[in-house]
Regions:
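Beta-rich, blade/repeat-based domains predominating
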Residues: 42-55, 85-97, 136-153, 182-204, ...
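Short, conserved, GDST-rich strand-edge loop motifs in beta-rich repeat architectures
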Residues: 44-56, 109-120, 206-223, 298-318
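Conserved beta-strand positions in repeat-built beta-propeller and related beta-rich domains
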Residues: 61-64, 100-106, 148-149, 154-161, ...
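Short loop/turn segments that connect beta-strands within beta-propeller blades
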Residues: 74-75, 113, 168-171, 231-233, ...
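Asp-box/WD-like beta-propeller blade repeats and closely related beta-sheet repeat scaffolds
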Residues: 120-194
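Beta-propeller blade signature
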Residues: 222-232, 312-327
Length: 327
């Protein structure tokens, strides 16, 4: 089973989280001239809203180039898309009470207010309403994936400083863990640490695009220099991955996206052996599960030096930006 929603036009990058042909439109994104670009629009398969309805869930997606947080919600058999503008949103973390969004220079926190939800239109059909509560200034740390752990502690992938960090009321961020090959904290994106997988409320797996201690050193071998690591040991579970992202532990298995190949893979954490189980026409970033279903974010990938020389850009295929659901 594969179902899809495509975010068309100016949408080039996605991150996501979960907790008939349809079409929706919104205004042009923040920081982009609305007079020069068409509106952001989406097209989906008939089964997509039906799946969300069966799950009794909505899907939250960020697209950093379009500057949007997008909520995909089932409504009367159709898909309702709700857009909100943010400054280059990427990382998302959520539970029943809190929604946090990592953007350019800060992390914004929203609190679920059930009393407000009861008063929102359509009356009786809105079961959650996340209201803005505070914003934490991090500076330019290139926030990638985030996750809530034990005691609602927010863990953040600090890509610029090559570490995992948390937040407090005094500092921009508090470094908590870094790969063993990183010798110090400096804002030069040495290994492009990006993905974070939690187990039992604690960080357990991370991905990086290179095993390097040099400033932006990961770029030299981005095609197949990616690694999947254990936390806190720092042991490298597997190497030679093509731009890996979004490690997840689900149903007793370790999953990871090889973005450079557009794949969803299963990894044996003991041997490091990995097997692709699904291939998609896009740069895979952002992964969440609901039962047997995997929700996967896809980006089109811009033709720049950063993305040149990787398998998916060398293939003569039409790349999509959106969300795929794989059973």
């Amino acid at each position: 089973l594969v179902v899809k929603i495509f975010l068309e036009s100016i949408c080039k990058g996605t991150r996501l989280t979960t907790k008939q042909q349809g079409e929706n439109q919104t205004e042009s994104p923040a920081k982009i001239d609305a007079n020069t670009l068409p509106p952001l629009r989406s097209v989906h398969t008939e089964s997509f809203p039906l799946i969300l309805s069966e799950m009794r869930s909505s899907l939250a997606v960020t697209t950093y180039q379009a500057g949007k947080l997008v909520f995909l919600r089932p409504q009367d058999g159709k898909l309702n898309t709700h857009f909100r503008a943010f400054d280059s949103p990427m990382g998302l973390a959520a539970n029943q009470q809190i929604l946090s969004i990592g953007t350019s220079g800060y992390i914004s926190h929203f609190r679920n207010m059930p009393a407000v939800a009861q008063k929102r239109e359509p009356i009786g059909k809105v079961d959650a309403c996340f209201m803005p509560r505070d914003s934490h200034t991090t500076g330019d740390i290139l926030v990638h994936e985030m996750a809530y752990g034990n005691n609602n502690e927010l863990w953040v992938v600090n890509t610029r400083f090559s570490c995992l960090c948390t937040l407090d009321n005094v500092n921009s961020f508090v470094p908590r863990w870094k790969p063993p090959f990183i010798t110090g904290y400096s804002p030069n994106d040495r290994c492009h640490l990006n993905g974070l997988g939690m187990v039992d409320g604690k960080p357990k797996y991370v991905t990086a695009l290179g095993e390097t201690n040099k400033p932006t050193g990961w770029r030299a071998n981005k095609k197949d220099g990616g690694i999947l690591m254990d936390v806190p040991s720092g042991e490298i579970i597997t190497r030679n991955l093509s731009m890996p992202h979004s490690p997840r532990w689900h149903n007793g298995q370790l999953w990871v996206l090889e973005s450079g190949k557009g794949t969803l893979s299963i990894v044996d954490p003991k041997t490091g052996k990995h097997e692709a189980i699904a291939i998609m026409p896009g740069f895979t970033r952002g992964l969440d599960f609901f039962g047997p279903l995997a929700f996967i974010g896809l980006s089109q990938v811009r033709e720049t030096a950063v993305f040149s020389g990787i398998p998916i850009t060398e293939q003569n295929i039409e790349r999509n930006s959106g969300v795929w659901v794989v059973n």
